[in-house]
Amino acid sequence: MGNQLDRITHLNYSELPTGDPSGIEKDELRVGVAYFFSDDEEDLDERGQPDKFGVKAPPGCTPCPESPSRHHHHLLHQLVLNETQFSAFRGQECIFSKVSGGPQGADLSVYAVTALPALCEPGDLLELLWLQPAPEPPAPAPHWAVYVGGGQIIHLHQGEIRQDSLYEAGAANVGRVVNSWYRYRPLVAELVVQNACGHLGLKSEEICWTNSESFAAWCRFGKREFKAGGEVPAGTQPPQQQYYLKVHLGENKVHTARFHSLEDLIREKRRIDASGRLRVLQELADLVDDKE
């Protein structure tokens, strides 16, 4: 694939990064959550998967050599987790899906962190996870990052946007590529990396993202909705502009929560993720052997 573009993506204004170039916005929303229940799952709308692009590292980033081909991923050891599955909608439009099964189902397999560079290209979104035995306290919420090549990631960690080695970031032991979970049209990979690098070094008081997922997703999709205070004041939106998080409970049972902003939906989704335990359906010894 190299650095040759497979296609040229024409972006409209709604897909470009907005707001202050420093990423600083002062507005902040505080809204309540309304819950209701449904027995039927809605079908997810069909969206094409984004093409990949070769990129060059922008100024300020550590040089990013090309990652090994991802075509050999079938040779890598996969783990399957028993974890909470979600989908999210704005009105009737599906904007996020972490649901397995079906032709549009997400691949929820995870890999040892040491195997991820073979699956990644610069501009990819990664979700990093900590696996713990069931008796242990719940693990932290999944951590999101932008892969910039050469085994390096840029992420929001402990109140700072920083560049770290993928192998050392937060001591996570497994991860996966999650480019397709959000259904927005992505920016070209070079711009994704540029967005991430352009905010390196920002501290808590300068950051307008409330968690690692919102920052990484903003880098890839450039939508101001991922920023704190990036949407209209609560209570002024019609139902078709409100957000709905569906927690899939199995046996066609769905728990649905309504939100006035994407920021609050992501916060609740991550709270549920952090309160659950990731239980490996295969022996943890397999993971240890794979890392060795």
Curated annotation (Swiss-Prot):
GO terms for cellular component: cytoplasm
Record bears the keyword Phosphoprotein: yes
Pfam families per record: LRAT (PF04970)
Keyword check for Cytoplasm: yes
Annotated localization: Cytoplasm
Main location: cytoplasm
Domain LRAT: 133-228
GO BP: cell morphogenesis; cell motility
Family membership: Belongs to the LRATD family.
Function: May play a role in cell morphology and motility.
UniProt name for this protein: Protein LRATD1
Organism: Homo sapiens (Human)
Gene (name only): LRATD1
